Amino acid sequence: MTDIIVTQTLNTIGLRCPEPIMLLRKKIRHMQEGETLLILADDPATTRDIPSFCQFMDHNLLKSDLENTPFKYWIKKGK
C-alpha cells in the first residue's frame, strides 16, 4: 500500500462515545471530497462506530491500526 497523505487530523483521545463520532461528523463536513482525515482515539467503541459511520455516510476507511492505543483511522471523504 502506498503512503497515505493526511490532510486533516482529529484527536479524540480521552473522549468517550458519542463524542468521537460527533466530532468526526463535524470535522469531515468541512473537508473537501477526496481529502484524508487521520483520527486518533482511545475509546474502544470507536472500533465499531467509526467503520459503521464510514459505511453509512459513504466515506472510505482506508486503513485502521487497532493494535495499540491510540487507535488510528485513516478516512477518505466521499461525496
Curated annotation (Swiss-Prot):
Gene3D superfamilies, per the entry: TusA-like domain
Single GO BP term: tRNA wobble position uridine thiolation
Coiled-coil residue spans: none
Short name of one Pfam family: TusA
Species: Histophilus somni (strain 129Pt)
Subcellular localization(s) per the UniProt record: Cytoplasm
Record bears the keyword Cytoplasm: yes
Protein role: Sulfur carrier protein which probably makes part of a sulfur-relay system.
UniProt similarity note: Belongs to the sulfur carrier protein TusA family.
GO molecular function: sulfur carrier activity
Protein name: Sulfur carrier protein TusA
Primary localisation category: cytoplasm
